[in-house]
């Protein structure tokens, strides 16, 4: 394992499994293509799992949490203390993702990379204590390189635990007051896009608040403009600990051969960073939904991603990806359990 492990090769998709799964789809008792994207996603999962009939019995959800120094600029509708409070809610079973994980029978892990709440120690939470949140990126780099690499490794470690537990699908979620500001800034820097196109209300800012948020991002982009061509340094300049952990998790999944279901805007920006760092990881990423945050559509289009759902979500936590899991499971069930024309003694072409 090299020091810059995130640049290591990604696993190859099993092309034989893809071909055989596609051939099976042609033999199932239905008109070819009549199940639409349920067919293509089952074939895609076959290639990622290396088996003609993929299954999604074991789903792992990691929630990465971290606070953001840029909140000092007044860019969020909620106080920073909410990040630490939500950690308790996650492990107590009261958060949306907690309910979804229970209903899906998924393993839920909560990782605190660094919040402003001092000496936070909660049973059931992994506290990595990288720092008391990031620094204010409108005035300097959000994190040091050492902190950034620790956050990347934190994401990778979650994936290694998931793989050891037999996970067939990895979902990363996030919690961090101020993190839509960080994600918007990152996306603007990487895509060289107008700030107003990628900046939205987050957890509930009004129009005046969104305008102020955009102005803060403009200042930060000007401050860090010289390093905009370096995706990793841009992540460290403008990102959050939890965003860096997501980047590390997505890259580790591609290297370890675990399929990823990407959640909303913040997670999709993390996916964009991951693809910029190691383009081969893109094959391992599926996208759960298109959310309400205005920048989400643009980042999805840049990645050539077709999300499974569009429900106007803007919660985060991995919730949109979790909601798409039943759809993926049913796609696998249809693919694996439907009869072929030969098995059912049904004519496979019109009279």
UniProtKB/Swiss-Prot annotation:
Pathway: Nucleoside biosynthesis; alpha-ribazole biosynthesis; alpha-ribazole from 5,6-dimethylbenzimidazole: step 1/2. GO terms for molecular function: nicotinate-nucleotide-dimethylbenzimidazole phosphoribosyltransferase activity. It catalyses: 5,6-dimethylbenzimidazole + nicotinate beta-D-ribonucleotide = alpha-ribazole 5'-phosphate + nicotinate + H(+). It is an enzyme of class 2 (transferase). One of its GO terms (biological process) is cobalamin biosynthetic process. The lineage of its organism: Bacteria, Pseudomonadati, Pseudomonadota, Gammaproteobacteria, Pseudomonadales. It holds the Pfam family DBI_PRT. The active site is at 317 (proton acceptor). The keyword DNA-binding does not apply. Keywords: Cobalamin biosynthesis, Glycosyltransferase, Transferase. Catalyzes the synthesis of alpha-ribazole-5'-phosphate from nicotinate mononucleotide (NAMN) and 5,6-dimethylbenzimidazole (DMB). It comes from Pseudomonas fluorescens (strain Pf0-1). Its EC number is 2.4.2.21. Belongs to the CobT family. Coiled coil: none annotated. This is Nicotinate-nucleotide--dimethylbenzimidazole phosphoribosyltransferase. InterPro entries: Nict_dMeBzImd_PRibTrfase, Nict_dMeBzImd_PRibTrfase_bact, Nict_dMeBzImd_PRibTrfase_N, Nict_dMeBzImd_PRibTrfase_sf.
């Amino acid at each position: 394992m090299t020091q810059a492990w995130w640049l290591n090769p990604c696993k190859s998709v099993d092309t034989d499994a893809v071909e055989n799964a596609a051939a099976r789809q042609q033999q199932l008792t239905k008109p070819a293509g009549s199940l639409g994207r349920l067919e293509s996603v089952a074939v895609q999962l076959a290639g990622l799992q290396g088996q003609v009939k993929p299954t999604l019995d074991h789903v792992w959800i990691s929630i990465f949490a971290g606070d953001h120094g840029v909140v000092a600029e007044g860019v969020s509708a909620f106080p920073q203390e909410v990040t630490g409070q939500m950690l308790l809610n996650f492990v107590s079973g009261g958060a949306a993702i907690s309910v979804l994980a229970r209903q899906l029978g998924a393993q839920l892990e909560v990782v605190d990379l660094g919040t402003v709440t001092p000496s936070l120690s909660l049973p059931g939470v992994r506290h990595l204590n990288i720092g008391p949140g990031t620094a204010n990126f409108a005035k300097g780099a959000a994190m040091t390189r050492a902190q950034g690499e620790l956050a990347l490794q934190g994401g990778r470690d979650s994936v290694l635990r998931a793989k050891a537990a037999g996970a067939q699908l990895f979902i990363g979620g996030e919690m961090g007051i101020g993190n839509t500001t960080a994600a918007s800034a990152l996306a603007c820097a990487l895509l060289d896009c107008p700030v107003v196109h990628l900046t939205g209300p987050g957890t509930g800012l009004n129009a005046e608040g969104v305008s102020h948020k955009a102005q803060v991002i403009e200042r930060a982009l000007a401050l860090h403009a010289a390093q905009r061509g370096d995706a990793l340094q841009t992540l460290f300049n403008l990102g959050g600990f939890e965003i860096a952990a997501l980047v590390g998790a997505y890259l580790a999944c591609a290297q370890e051969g675990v399929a990823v279901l990407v959640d909303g805007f913040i997670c999709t920006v993390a996916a964009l960073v991951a693809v910029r760092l190691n383009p081969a990881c893109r094959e391992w990423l599926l996208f759960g939904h298109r959310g309400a945050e205005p920048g989400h559509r643009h980042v999805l289009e840049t990645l050539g991603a077709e999300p499974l759902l569009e429900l106007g979500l803007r919660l985060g936590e991995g919730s949109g990806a979790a909601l798409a899991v039943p759809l993926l499971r049913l796609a696998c069930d249809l693919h694996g359990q439907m009869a072929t024309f030969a098995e059912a003694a049904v004519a496979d072409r019109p009279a």
